[in-house]
Amino acid sequence: MADAAASPVGKRLLLLFADTAASASASAPAAAAASGDPGPALRTRAWRAGTVRAMSGAVPQDLAIFVEFDGCNWKQHSWVKVHAEEVIVLLLEGSLVWAPREDPVLLQGIRVSIAQWPALTFTPLVDKLGLGSVVPVEYLLDRELRFLSDANGLHLFQMGTDSQNQILLEHAALRETVNALISDQKLQEIFSRGPYSVQGHRVKIYQPEGEEGWLYGVVSHQDSITRLMEVSVTESGEIKSVDPRLIHVMLMDNSAPQSEGGTLKAVKSSKGKKKRESIEGKDGRRRKSASDSGCDPASKKLKGDRGEVDSNGSDGGEASRGPWKGGNASGEPGLDQRAKQPPSTFVPQINRNIRFATYTKENGRTLVVQDEPVGGDTPASFTPYSTATGQTPLAPEVGGAENKEAGKTLEQVGQGIVASAAVVTTASSTPNTVRISDTGLAAGTVPEKQKGSRSQASGENSRNSILASSGFGAPLPSSSQPLTFGSGRSQSNGVLATENKPLGFSFGCSSAQEAQKDTDLSKNLFFQCMSQTLPTSNYFTTVSESLADDSSSRDSFKQSLESLSSGLCKGRSVLGTDTKPGSKAGSSVDRKVPAESMPTLTPAFPRSLLNARTPENHENLFLQPPKLSREEPSNPFLAFVEKVEHSPFSSFASQASGSSSSATTVTSKVAPSWPESHSSADSASLAKKKPLFITTDSSKLVSGVLGSALTSGGPSLSAMGNGRSSSPTSSLTQPIEMPTLSSSPTEERPTVGPGQQDNPLLKTFSNVFGRHSGGFLSSPADFSQENKAPFEAVKRFSLDERSLACRQDSDSSTNSDLSDLSDSEEQLQAKTGLKGIPEHLMGKLGPNGERSAELLLGKSKGKQAPKGRPRTAPLKVGQSVLKDVSKVKKLKQSGEPFLQDGSCINVAPHLHKCRECRLERYRKFKEQEQDDSTVACRFFHFRRLIFTRKGVLRVEGFLSPQQSDPDAMNLWIPSSSLAEGIDLETSKYILANVGDQFCQLVMSEKEAMMMVEPHQKVAWKRAVRGVREMCDVCETTLFNIHWVCRKCGFGVCLDCYRLRKSRPRSETEEMGDEEVFSWLKCAKGQSHEPENLMPTQIIPGTALYNIGDMVHAARGKWGIKANCPCISRQNKSVLRPAVTNGMSQLPSINPSASSGNETTFSGGGGPAPVTTPEPDHVPKADSTDIRSEEPLKTDSSASNSNSELKAIRPPCPDTAPPSSALHWLADLATQKAKEETKEAGSLRSVLNKESHSPFGLDSFNSTAKVSPLTPKLFNSLLLGPTASNNKTEGSSLRDLLHSGPGKLPQTPLDTGIPFPPVFSTSSAGVKSKASLPNFLDHIIASVVENKKTSDASKRACNLTDTQKEVKEMVMGLNVLDPHTSHSWLCDGRLLCLHDPSNKNNWKIFRECWKQGQPVLVSGVHKKLKSELWKPEAFSQEFGDQDVDLVNCRNCAIISDVKVRDFWDGFEIICKRLRSEDGQPMVLKLKDWPPGEDFRDMMPTRFEDLMENLPLPEYTKRDGRLNLASRLPSYFVRPDLGPKMYNAYGLITAEDRRVGTTNLHLDVSDAVNVMVYVGIPIGEGAHDEEVLKTIDEGDADEVTKQRIHDGKEKPGALWHIYAAKDAEKIRELLRKVGEEQGQENPPDHDPIHDQSWYLDQTLRKRLYEEYGVQGWAIVQFLGDAVFIPAGAPHQVHNLYSCIKVAEDFVSPEHVKHCFRLTQEFRHLSNTHTNHEDKLQVKNIIYHAVKDAVGTLKAHESKLARS
């Protein structure tokens, strides 16, 4: 099993010295291998076995290891120089496997024949014999050594299942040996990598030079980054500094320590194990980043899947299991994997399809983490040493071992560690995913914590290691060049061979050579030696060759290996030499390659770059000054990537031979070109050609370099890599990586977007992978044909995925990753132009429900680990430029500014730290928060740094809006292709309902810009995936303009800034700490003065104003009425008519204007003639004078247009250039005219008939030929200004229904009905099938909404009229859709739909919904699986969970009760918990399932509920009318549920004054479904009490009838009030509170506090004093209650109920969401509703953006009409 640590310390080792090997020729082993029986010849050699106890050496030639040989006395243990002439073969412990065994085994004196026996494989570190494909194995227990001809008969040992193997169960000695081995490895992992600390534990330290061998002591301190530990020696009391990667340290149990020669026996301390498990689990919940794969819920599964999480952990059990599992047993030397891979990176493998998202709030920011189980393939991020000749990086983490110069102290060494970036590639056991981890980071560069986490991943990595061994040699210790990329993320793209051909990847590390020379880091002996060139015949090579079916591929592969070995830099070993074609596991076709498992490239740096890049090759993207123009659009951040031509394909392209026909062999071709490109000169030239940060545009990636190399066939995978990788080497890996692959491995999404289809890279990639069923990429067919950016991504990313994984490695992260966080995703997506699939659709794209979007996105972040990426997996942000000595040197010389690409702590600790970084040390959950440090940093990708002439790092400034790039812009502008889940009609409807709020937003932002002082520069804060930017004062989500402190990043929203600035300074000082909006202090306690803050915007450039432009243009073109602030301000006097008879009048038009004439206001004040053709069959009315403040000409003539109206657009006044932020205000008047021309003009002509009826009913009489257009026009009219709800005398409804044609009073036609039509209408010219009833309903609804009376007496007088109107309304709606089964409750005021699955429900539902009325849908329970929702089912499944209960009678909280206690008393009163007086309590479960865990905890119930929710258009997460679906997954997804509400019934008379849920309101719409009603048994019947409660609750007769006639089970009594009445209710409650002597603090609200239940007395008082009447609704089993946003409501359970609610955001009620968000700002910071989780402004923006984009895409229809 691979040792947990990357260092060889603690590993088993086999040595063959020259004197013992002289008798045999060096070729013997190879010959033996060819003959198929290499065993005997090798076995007879004098092999020396032992354990590595220490390591030393400052340069590769001096690398030495201290070996404790088996069976020798103390004096015979000695130091062995790894590269000494006498060392012929040096093999290091690899994976634990099941190996075939022919000879019987002697067990307890009995010989037993067993076919498979646990054995350790070994990986060559030095191989002068050329073992080739020979696999050395040492059987456990008797330690018999065997040499197998290949790895075909080996199967990876998997702790989860193999620990139960019969052999182990029967033989205790063998079982103990296996457990001891696993324990050793786990302990090494704990010592060597974070985030584990062994502080306070007893340890024993090996003393190579001492007489006693072991020294005992207690760890007094362990550095979380360098891992150096200070040990207090027990005997002497002195403090020793020890590096566990250089000297063997073992944990001791309380029992006396013992030394056991080769291995430690069960040394693992239980504490250590628990600690580790707790750490892994802990992280899970907080930050389920892909990296946390093993966390939390996932961890539960892990145990099942993998056996014990821990056990597999470093054991390679899991890690190495990849290649050996199932089909994987391709015989790859997967065994070695372990050895190669940084074993410690164990990532528990979780069910691939599982993904958990958590939203955690930290310091005002909410981060989303997704627990996507990483595919377990994540490569270890630590730096393994590169293995010589491509062998697996032996102890991958040796990299951890710092370069130790001879004179350096251990501490120095610790810090200087260079992780030779060994490529740890693991063939993931998961279906063939092979990952090459770019763990090129120097150990020093990667915070150990990361390593630790990575190390966890390494388990998976171990699988990767196979790949590594297969040719991905670890890049050597180029310490100086910390691989920036994924820092070891498993991102490296996994290689898949399509036709079972293994892919060989050579991972060269040559680029690092120079760097090595420059830096001490590179000196780490061990790493370097690892990198030294060894004969290419390593047995792994042979294996890979044998695996490859294609001889040509084999040859090329060999060549590549050879060239690598010979051509690599001198001190280094050829990393790729032994490339085995991706272990079979990785390559075999049968294996599925889950998209997630594929490593994603970070757009900036292809994985391959990692290993092989010369220091220069890999320039930090950010180095380049934003202003530099480059061939490719550069990200402002990416400043200066050295343009070394090293595009991964550069050299390779030219050299690749056509033989690479099999995609799998691609790498081999690339390899050859490698060495050459490494020369610094070459690299420089190469660099010039390709910026590292390649555009995601695949076409671009391919261009040039790939050019010739790619063959249409599917040639080299390498071509697929990001073109940007600067070093040729990278190309090797690249092949595997998808150019656009960089993001969340878990999103499986089509790989190739239409835009990319021509891209050879993509083609190749898709060809290679497309055939795999699980394939990493979906086939092109998945793509919609319209050019979607390959990344439908942005929008689509699931936040989950975005997880913060990136955060973790803040320090070590390289920019490549950086990009991943922000730019790269956007870039990719921008480049491809794909808009992105809504989050909700993402899961559907990939086979495993995993999403590859990120892959496409190019986020380096999610990279490959599909599943359970190790928590700390390196997949974080890439390493900072400042960690690379060569780059720092260049930056100092050039004096160029660069972007801060890491957290303040890691990048610029001596400069001002942002708030997040300053608080880092105080975090409660340190390990978890570590992950976020980089991404959560306020200055990450925001602040610009620069070196002064003296080399001192200083702040140069911040990014400006002009430095945004197309990729960043892509997130904020409509996609060129159609957005998913939104059609033409929906777009118009959204614009009609939400457009005004959007305009309000824009106006607000413009006002904010006016507040910016002339001398101030506006900065640009790029949106960071998975981070919700929040105001530090009121915690509202920051939408765009805000003000930021340059020193600490403190940010305030526009409202708080305005409030503070407008307050006199004296008043501000007096407020002190009691100020409602407390402004936090700056770094040194100074207060934040508004004038010192820096104005900052989030939306790049002028995107916001451009969308505003498009909104007005679209409204004009499509005839969508507007009532937005911008129009009303400019045309107020002209456009706002008086109201008559409930309808708004058309401004500037007298009653006869309806004669079909259109009026237009010309921008210049002159008349603008407009002709509006109308259908010939519509009679025209004579035009009359038009009254207007400005002269207007109207043309009363109407021309025939085949029933299609074509409005002639009035000339537009000159407008400012589009670039002007305010230019769209310029022609508001003209646009307004256009809108009216489109809608009202023709309508007027149609309706005209002497202007008699505003609705022109005459034109609809039976004999009239009605234009199909007419109804649509009418609907458009209704979309008009919702001006006034006031009505003058009479009711237009009554007049309409009771009067004959032409008898209604004449009124202007521009009506202001306050709600849009049921069928959103397209502009004039588009035919509609709607008919009279369709808009008759609008009229009816309008009347009902506007029928108001000022006081109770008036209401009483009008009772008769109201009843008539209700009947008429019911009649109208019945006519509207007679096929929708429904009835009316609450005296005709509440719609009840009877068939939840009727697809037409939305039509009638919308009419009531847009008026703010609740709606009831019955019968949902008939669709649900009833057995899932029974109390006993919950009790059985979750009974042991601890929960908090609330006593409904007194609101007391009862903590830490088993949930079983609650469920047992659900229907049996005698089993209920009792209060102090002995009475059974009425309880409700508090927040269960907790937080957002419903989906994760109860997946089956989640699916059952979501599939059967009524009105799916609104309620489903991807519903077309659910605006929350429009929020790109790039952002933190709002928590919309589902949430469960479980409570007993309040069944006594005293309980009628108490509520189960007190009066409150929600910021979003919700549907609440009654899934179970439990009628309690015992202590008397309560039916009569329940009926009395219903009667006193004001329920109507129809409802009561349901109980008597239908025998239905009533569950709960609801009282819901209209949102518009909330203020009146608030006023009453304040009044009652004062009467009762209660205080009313300003930061509290009687409704938001949920402290009141309106009993019968209060409800009566509310009606009498304020005229407010609500809806009394009895919710029966299966009833779904729809509650509008902002509507106050309360619930009283009649019986025990289980209810489940899902929130949504409907277009009709966005205005309430908008208003409530502002209300919540003023609540106290501790208030549950205080935080703005809905992000309503962002939702409005993106909904409008998508709607406008869709309308633009359909403009051709307008042209045709």
From Swiss-Prot:
- What is its cofactor? Fe(2+)
**At which residues is Phosphothreonine found?**
T614
- UniProt motif LXXLL motif: location: 1293-1297
Single Gene Ontology MF annotation: histone H3K9me/H3K9me2 demethylase activity
Q: Where in the cell is it found?
A: Nucleus
Give UniProt keywords alphabetically: Acetylation, Chromatin regulator, Dioxygenase, Disease variant, Dwarfism, Intellectual disability, Iron, Isopeptide bond, Metal-binding, Nucleus, Oxidoreductase, Phosphoprotein, Transcription, Transcription regulation, Ubl conjugation, Zinc, Zinc-finger
* Listed Gene3D superfamilies: Cupin (2.60.120.650)
Tell me the InterPro entries matching this sequence. DUF7030, JHDM2-like, JmjC_dom, KDM3AB_Tudor, PWWP_KDM3B
Q: Which domain of life is it from?
A: Eukaryota
Q: Name one GO biological process term.
A: regulation of transcription by RNA polymerase II
Q: Which residues carry this modification: N6-acetyllysine?
A: K361
Cofactor binding note: Binds 1 Fe(2+) ion per subunit.
Region annotation (Disordered) maps to 253-346, 370-394, 438-496, 572-603, 714-762, 805-827, 1142-1220
* Primary location group: nucleus
Q: Where does Fe cation bind?
A: H1560, D1562, H1689
Q: Where is the composition biased (Polar residues)?
A: 380-392, 453-468, 477-495, 723-745, 1142-1161, 1194-1204
Q: Where is the JmjC domain?
A: 1498-1721
Q: What is recorded about the domains?
A: Leu-Xaa-Xaa-Leu-Leu (LXXLL) motifs are known to mediate the association with nuclear receptors.
* Protein name stated in the entry: Lysine-specific demethylase 3B
Task: Name the source organism.
Answer: Homo sapiens (Human)
From the broadest rank down, the organism's phylogenetic lineage runs:
Eukaryota, Metazoa, Chordata, Craniata, Vertebrata
